[in-house]
Swiss-Prot record:
The gene is atpB. Disulfide bonds: none annotated. One of its GO terms (molecular function) is proton-transporting ATP synthase activity, rotational mechanism. It comes from Haloferax volcanii (strain ATCC 29605 / DSM 3757 / JCM 8879 / NBRC 14742 / NCIMB 2012 / VKM B-1768 / DS2) (Halobacterium volcanii). This is A-type ATP synthase subunit B. One of its GO terms (cellular component) is plasma membrane. It is a peripheral membrane protein. The keyword Transport applies.
């Protein structure tokens, strides 16, 4: 272990020290203050004879007389099944007042990419209890499905709802229910948001099956880049060593990318698009690609990263690059939010690329794909007609067009809108879908198999009259 007492400058969260030998990039550092307090940091920049260290806990109490110890290793996460139910800060230290964590082992937080040959294709359904996701943009075990939101929208409420409600439905054939866990990584959140998260986790009992990492807005930027890696290292251990199905929720990835930009500026790197580092695509891929399933292992890692699009712009580098790497997106819509729709998910620009592999008979229900396709088509038709109504008025529309307008309104009010406390099973979601589709004449249901229409279509006086 190398120890120095050569601090030359302290600037904000940065400490600069002179060294007489090469120091590794990202190496972990312990700084002991003259008062005996020990703080941890990470090497941000290492040049000949001088290193820049970003301190996790802030630089208060550190002066030129402090001792700097270079530990010769990068950050490692102590992993154990006992992490379930615990709350940690953004650098992996417990902050819940619980007992000391005794790890089974310590793992490098960078992790290793899953060998493509040993990957198993994601194809089992995860039920979030949210109709707009389960019914229209189904989440599949091992998938990475981001939520695209914007400033002022209730993405945190949706994140908590998913963390609370998400389950892997019981395998009826084996009669066994797989163990399910949630790893929740919050980056750059305010103290108020952190308190809301913890109150919700504790009130609903979701904390028992969760590991929570919280990096606050006033914590150092380098810690923000560490938090998702700690969360994913924990998830990989629970999934591939302990056979859990783990859902990783990361919020807010925009704060993570801002931290990358801040660190890049401190290193005087040549910036890329809009000042973000040129390697941001690779960096994000290193996080997102840690989702998946491995042959011969029972567990899985599924990711829901949440990001706020600056200026509601989906061409901004953060959502743009995220869209290239991930397998779809869920859009939080500002107009739906202003109408009081909760959660305000717009199904039309949303997409789950792996949905078709995780639904159908034996997974969800035989009619799932057809119902989803038909609702997409009917809602899109209703949306187009809304634009027409603004020009010609509703009385100028045909009876058929009015039915589609009514469908669009009921679809938003009854299917998408369910509140943040309602947990719907996939059966409930599909039944609501049939209830809405049954307001349209059977002749309009051209995306659904006739046998399914006979089994599920709800005939009423209006429909019979329309058919006649």
């Amino acid at each position: 272990m190398k120890e120095y007492q050569t601090i030359t400058e302290i600037s904000g969260p940065l400490v600069f020290a002179e060294v007489d030998e090469p120091i590794g990039y990202d190496e972990i550092v312990e700084i002991e203050t003259p008062q005996g307090e020990t703080k941890r940091g990470q090497v941000l920049e290492s040049s000949e004879g001088l290193v820049a260290i970003q301190v996790f806990e802030g630089t208060s109490g550190i002066d030129r007389n402090a001792s700097v110890r270079f530990l010769g290793e990068t950050l490692k996460m102590p992993v154990t099944e006992d992490l379930l139910g615990r709350v940690l800060d953004g650098s992996g230290q417990p902050i819940d007042g619980g007992p000391e964590i005794v790890p089974d082992e310590r793992r490098d937080i960078v992790g290793a990419a899953i060998n493509p040959y040993s990957r198993e294709y994601p194809e089992e359904f995860i039920q979030t209890g949210v109709s707009a996701i389960d019914g229209m943009n189904t989440l599949v075990r091992g998938q990475k499905l981001p939520i695209f939101s914007a400033s002022g929208l209730p993405h945190n409420d949706l994140a908590l709802q998913i963390a609370r409600q998400a389950t892997v439905p019981e395998d009826e054939e084996s009669g066994e229910e797989s163990e399910f866990a949630v790893v929740f990584g919050a980056m750059g959140i305010t103290q108020e948001e952190a308190n809301e998260f913890m109150e919700d986790f504790e009130r609903t009992g979701a904390l028992e099956r969760s590991v929570v990492f919280t990096n606050l807005a006033d914590d150092p930027a380098v810690e923000r880049t560490v938090t998702p890696r700690l969360a994913l290292t924990t998830a990989e251990y629970l999934a591939f060593d302990k056979d859990y199905h783990v859902l990783v929720i990361l919020t807010d990835m925009t704060n993570y990318c801002e931290a990358l930009r801040e660190i890049g500026a401190a290193r005087e790197e040549v910036p890329g698009r809009r000042g973000y580092p040129g390697y941001m695509y690779t960096d994000l891929a290193q996080l997102y690609e840690r989702a998946g399933r491995i042959q011969g292992r029972d567990g899985s890692v599924t990711q829901i990263p949440i990001l706020t699009m600056p200026g509601d712009d989906d061409t901004h580098p953060i959502p743009d690059l995220t869209g290239y790497i991930t397998e779809g997106q869920i859009y939080i819509d500002r107009d739906l939010n202003s109408q009081g729709i909760r959660p305000p998910i717009n199904p039309l620009p949303s997409l789950s690329r792996l949905m078709d592999d995780g639904i159908g008979e034996g997974l969800t229900r035989e009619d799932h794909a057809d119902v989803s396709d038909q609702m997409y088509a009917a809602y899109a038709e209703g949306e187009d007609l809304r634009d027409l109504v603004n020009i010609v008025g509703r009385e100028a529309l045909s009876e058929r067009d009015n039915k589609y307008l009514d469908f669009a309104e009921r679809f938003e009010a009854e299917f998408v809108n369910q509140g943040f406390d309602t947990d719907r099973s996939i059966e409930d979601t599909l039944d609501i879908g049939w209830d809405l589709l049954s307001t349209l004449p059977k002749s309009e249901l051209n995306r659904i198999d006739e046998e399914l229409i006979e089994d599920y279509y709800e005939d009423d006086a209006e429909s019979v009259e329309a058919e006649a």
